[in-house]
């Protein structure tokens, strides 16, 4: 069967392929091979620039330009050649080494030092740095920019609706009012914390040999400070150096990375569900799009499908990334191979994330606040003013203020007239009484507006 969007196994590359395109060049097999080629070439260039390694002369500009061109112009044809070699070697990293040795034959200067390609390296030296570069690239070029788009959209809602009052609900029951914008601001603040945590997450790498002790390195060049050499190389790639590892970099940072993404996603799930609920309560209307159908049998339906789509895909994303975070830091003794197949799925969870983020933004774009309904609902719940009234009563020493308001309001609908009459009978200063009399459920919003403006 010919491969197409209709025949792919995963909906990430099928139905939703346009949503996750930005990750393909990073986490695909092609992307992994390109990063491996990059690391191998940078390692050879580092060796050549080291005077103590006399067997590899300092490379000429022509040789360095040639190597850099292999990285910059790495093509699908190059990747296919590596896969062709792998069919013989049955070893993916060795296939990259042999590919580069083939390439080096075009330049005698490089052919002469081709045995220093992959010098003293274990496969995991190349792999861990490649995976780190993949995650770093994805974070900086895709994930954080996508997060910023969501934060900006929800911030826009916060500012646009900062003055529109909303009947809060705790335990599903009417509670002290807020504003629509303030509820959006709460989400923005939470998301910004996770943004900062992912942004600051260390992305670690190592290049220290088969068990992390530079055994092979020291056997060939015992007078080189390989510990320092390793640090210089890893940091030259823009990564943080991990000096203590077994054969593998232990992947703790990957768990931290995905944990931050999972937390961000969990906040978005909470947001999706709240918006779904607000739509159900008629707090928000959804703008209709010409030609769209909400139900195959009920023509009137306008469903909150975007928030539902987002919630579902974030659940899938979190399931994958939670497994990665729990599995990858565990490896038997100096290493086992269980991480290898799991690491090939680094981009899967993030792919579901991109689908979800696009859906949430689409859902937001359709929202239109139903201000009149919100005000009507507040006007039907004057009992929420029991809180400020009993608090003022406490201030002026009135006996059992809470109990008196409880008797008046608990489990009851109290209208404006009953609340005004209760206030009028209070033995409190006239100016305080007048202030309470002016209060309505729609104006009892505390510092909600100011809090949005301080965001």
Regions of interest found by a model, annotated:
Residues 136-144, 148, 185-188, 192, ...:
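Short amphipathic alpha-helical segments with heptad-repeat character
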Residues 42-47, 99, 103, 138, ...:
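Generic, well-ordered alpha-helical scaffold segments in large soluble proteins
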Residues 160-164, 197-200, 204, 235, ...:
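Conserved helix-loop functional segments at active or binding sites
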Residues 226-247, 251:
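Active-site-adjacent "gating/activation" loops or surface patches in catalytic cores
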Residues 194, 246-335:
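Glycine-rich anion/phosphate-binding loop at the beta-strand->alpha-helix junction
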Residues 2-29, 65-76, 293-455:
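Catalytic-core signal marking the mid-to-C-terminal active-site face
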Residues 2-217, 221-232, 294, 307, ...:
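A helix-coil-helix interface module used to build multimeric assemblies
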């Amino acid at each position: 069967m010919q491969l197409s969007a209709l025949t792919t196994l995963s909906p990430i590359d099928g139905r939703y392929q346009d949503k996750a395109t930005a990750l393909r060049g990073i986490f695909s097999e092609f992307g992994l091979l390109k990063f491996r080629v990059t690391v191998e070439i940078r390692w050879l260039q580092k060796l050549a620039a080291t005077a103590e390694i006399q067997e590899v002369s300092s490379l000429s500009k022509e040789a360095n330009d040639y190597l850099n061109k292999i990285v910059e112009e790495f093509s699908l044809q190059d990747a296919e050649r590596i896969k062709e070699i792998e069919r013989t070697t049955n070893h993916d990293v060795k296939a990259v080494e042999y590919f580069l040795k083939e390439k080096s034959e075009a330049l005698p200067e490089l052919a002469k030092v081709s045995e220093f390609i992959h010098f003293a390296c274990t496969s995991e030296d190349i792999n861990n740095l490649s995976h780190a570069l993949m995650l770093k690239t994805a974070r900086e070029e895709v994930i954080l920019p996508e997060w910023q788009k969501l934060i900006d959209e929800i911030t826009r809602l916060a500012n646009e609706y900062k003055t529109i009052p909303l009947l809060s609900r705790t335990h599903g029951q009417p509670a002290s009012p807020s504003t629509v914008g303030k509820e959006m601001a709460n989400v923005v603040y939470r998301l910004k914390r996770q943004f900062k945590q992912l942004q600051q997450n260390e992305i670690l790498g190592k290049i220290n040999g088969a068990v992390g002790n530079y055994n092979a390195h020291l056997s060939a060049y015992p007078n080189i400070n390989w510990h320092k050499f390793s640090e210089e190389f890893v940091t030259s790639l823009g990564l943080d150096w991990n000096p203590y590892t077994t054969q593998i970099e232990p992947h703790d940072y990957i768990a931290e990375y995905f944990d931050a993404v999972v937390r961000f996603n969990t906040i978005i799930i909470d947001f999706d569900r709240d918006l779904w609920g607000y739509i159900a309560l008629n707090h928000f209307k959804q703008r209709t799009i010409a030609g769209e159908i909400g139900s195959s049998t009920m023509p009137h339906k306008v469903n909150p499908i975007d928030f539902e789509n987002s919630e579902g895909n974030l659940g899938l994303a979190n399931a994958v990334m939670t497994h990665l975070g729990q599995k990858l830091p565990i490896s038997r003794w100096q290493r086992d191979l269980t991480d290898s197949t799991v690491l090939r799925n680094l981009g899967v969870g993030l792919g579901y994330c991109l689908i979800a983020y696009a859906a949430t933004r689409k859902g937001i774009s359709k929202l239109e606040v139903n201000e009149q309904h919100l005000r009507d609902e507040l006007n039907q719940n004057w009992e929420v003013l029991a809180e400020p009234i009993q608090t003022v009563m406490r201030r002026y020493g009135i006996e059992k203020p809470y109990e008196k308001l409880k008797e008046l309001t608990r489990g009851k609908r109290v209208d404006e007239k009953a609340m005004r009459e209760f206030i009028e009978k209070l033995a409190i200063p006239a100016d305080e009484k007048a202030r309470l009399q002016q209060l309505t459920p729609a104006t009892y919003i505390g510092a909600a507006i100011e809090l949005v403006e301080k965001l």
